[in-house]
C-alpha cells in the first residue's frame, strides 16, 4: 500500500533541512527479516542538529518511529504511518576512545564498539560483540548477552525529544532493567558514553572470539532472522520452554522456528511479516498451554497489518 505523500506540505516549513526525506520508502530491505511495508516518511538526518531541527518542525500529530539496522524488528505488512527516523553511520556512527571510556554514536554497530574497546585495551564490553544491531538500539532495550548488559557499562547517553529538545541521561536516571529502559519512548538516542576497565588486548580478544564461536555454533546467524524473539522469564530459558512445548521447526507460511535455536524465528525465503508474527503468537500460545508461562516479545513489532 501507499500512504498519502506528506512531503509537499512539510518541506516549506523545513528550508534548512539537510538530511534525506523520502515518501513511501520501502522498509523491508532495512530489516533483517526482509519483510514489511513502506514508511510513509523516511528521514535520514545529517547529524544531531539536523534531527532536532526536523523533529521541532514536524507537526505534533505525525507519529515518529526509529529504525536502526532492523535486527530486532518486525515491520508489519501494511507499513508504518508517520515519520520513520533512521540514523546512518555518517553523522551517528563514530567511535572514539578517551582513557577507559568509549564514546559512540547511536548508529555505531555493537560489534564495532566492542572492537574499538578491544583495540584500546578496554575490557568489559566484550558482550557487545555478540549482539546484532546498533548501540542506540542496545541502549533502548538494555541489551545483553554472555553475562553482560548495557547497564553494567553505561555512563551517559544523549537523545533528542519529540519536540527537538536535547536530553542527557546518567545511568541511574535511565532506570534500566532486563531488556528495558525507563526513558520515554519518544526520545531518540544519538550518542552514548560507556566505561570499561583497562585489560590486556589479547585477553579481551580471546573473550570476543569465544562469543563469536558460540554465536556461530548455537544461533542461525546466516538466516533472515531478528535475533532472540522472546525475553527469558525469571529463572527460565525461553528456548527451552519453546522446545518443551514442541515448537522446534514449527512453520507458519514462510516463517519457521529455527531448528538450531528455538528462540529464533527465521524467514525461509517467502515469509510475510504476518507469517512471522502469527508464528510467534502460536509459539506463545503453545508455551502457555504446556507450561503456564506467558512469553513476552523481545522483538519489537511496529506498523499496521496489510
Swiss-Prot record:
The gene is murB. It catalyses: UDP-N-acetyl-alpha-D-muramate + NADP(+) = UDP-N-acetyl-3-O-(1-carboxyvinyl)-alpha-D-glucosamine + NADPH + H(+). This is UDP-N-acetylenolpyruvoylglucosamine reductase. HAMAP family: MurB (MF_00037). Its cofactor is FAD. It is an enzyme of class 1 (oxidoreductase). GO terms for molecular function: FAD binding; UDP-N-acetylmuramate dehydrogenase activity. It is found in: Cytoplasm. The active site is at 179, 228 (proton donor), 298.
Amino acid at each position: 500500500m501507499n500512504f498519502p505523500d506528506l512531503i509537499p506540505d512539510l518541506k516549506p516549513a523545513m528550508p534548512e533541512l539537510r538530511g534525506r526525506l523520502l515518501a513511501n520508502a520501502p522498509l523491508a530491505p532495512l530489516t533483517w527479516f526482509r519483510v514489511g511495508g513502506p514508511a510513509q516518511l523516511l528521514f535520514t538526518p545529517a547529524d544531531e542538529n539536523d534531527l532536532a531541527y526536523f523533529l521541532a518542525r514536524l507537526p505534533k500529530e505525525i507519529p515518529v518511529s526509529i529504525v536502526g539496522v532492523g535486527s530486532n524488528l518486525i515491520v508489519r505488512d501494511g507499513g508504518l504511518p508517520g515519520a520513520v527516523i533512521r540514523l546512518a553511520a555518517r553523522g551517528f556512527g563514530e567511535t572514539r576512545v578517551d582513557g577507559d571510556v568509549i564514546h559512540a554514536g547511536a548508529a555505531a554497530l555493537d560489534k564495532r564498539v566492542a572492537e574499538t574497546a578491544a583495540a584500546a585495551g578496554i575490557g568489559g564490553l566484550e558482550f557487545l560483540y555478540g549482539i546484532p544491531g546498533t548501540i542506540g538500539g542496545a541502549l533502548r532495550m538494555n541489551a545483553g548477552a554472555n553475562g553482560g548488559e548495557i547497564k553494567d557499562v553505561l555512563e551517559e547517553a544523549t537523545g533528542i525529544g519529540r519536540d527537538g529538545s536535547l536530553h542527557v541521561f546518567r545511568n541511574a536516571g535511565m532506570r534500566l532493567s532486563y531488556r528495558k529502559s525507563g526513558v520515554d519512548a519518544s526520545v531518540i538516542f544519538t550518542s552514548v558514553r560507556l566505561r570499561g576497565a583497562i585489560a590486556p588486548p589479547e585477553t579481551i580478544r580471546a573473550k570476543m572470539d569465544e562469543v563469536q564461536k558460540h554465536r556461530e555454533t548455537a544461533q542461525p546467524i546466516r538466516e533472515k532472522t531478528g535475533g532472540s524473539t522472546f525475553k527469558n522469564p525469571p529463572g527460565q530459558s525461553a528456548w527451552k520452554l519453546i522446545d518443551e512445548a514442541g515448537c522446534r521447526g514449527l512453520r507458519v507460511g514462510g516463517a519457521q522456528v529455527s531448528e538450531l535455536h528455538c528462540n529464533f524465528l527465521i524467514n525461509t525465503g517467502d515469509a510475510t511479516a504476518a507469517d512471522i508474527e502469527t508464528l510467534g503468537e502460536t509459539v506463545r500460545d503453545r508455551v502457555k498451554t504446556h507450561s503456564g508461562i506467558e512469553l513476552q516479545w523481545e522483538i519489537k513489532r511496529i506498523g499496521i497489518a496489510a
